[in-house]
Amino acid sequence: AWVTSAHRAIQALNEKYGGGFYLFFRRPAFSAQDEKYMGWERKRGALTELVRLLKRKSTGLRTEVGEEDWLREVTYVITLDGDTSLNVGTAREMVGAMAHPLNQPVVDGQRRVVTSGHALFQPRVAVELEAANRSFFSRVYGGLGGVDPYGSTASDVYHDLFDQGTYTGKGIFQVEAFFTCLDGRFPENAILSHDLLEGSYLRAGLLGEVE
């Protein structure tokens, strides 16, 4: 029943807004280590399989709703977690930064790593005003909620010194560079925290003025 409901919801969005919404399903894979069927390589596998789909490669991801032909034109992918939302205009600013000539990634084909430019950008991440006071934990660790108009002038040590920031799983990456550098790169059932690794190979940059 939930599959049918999902179909109807996505189709309704496409009818209302003229297309652009997709519904994907991942084929479960048996994990001998966990002794159960699950998404291959968890979230890291989800990104890998999405990129493989965009590149017309073998993947456990299938398109249930939406035209696959349009997917071949996808150049960038924006990654968000379930507890993350985009501010108005953030997506446009991230795409603009990725498309800037000075930021174009240069990939070492032999080492399969970005050597200059950036194939991934990490924007500033802040706690929403409402969420900052939702619990004692968020009040302690979340700091001040909302958008900070003055913090945009602050620097980041990693990016300032090495022209390379850290990636925490929320940002934008170039599909071509991701596929070249990361597809089949890591052993299975060995990595849970994959964000920093991906950011290192793709030479993540920090968008300090984008939140």
Language-model segment annotations:
Residues A1-E211:
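Internal catalytic domains of large membrane-associated glycosyltransferases
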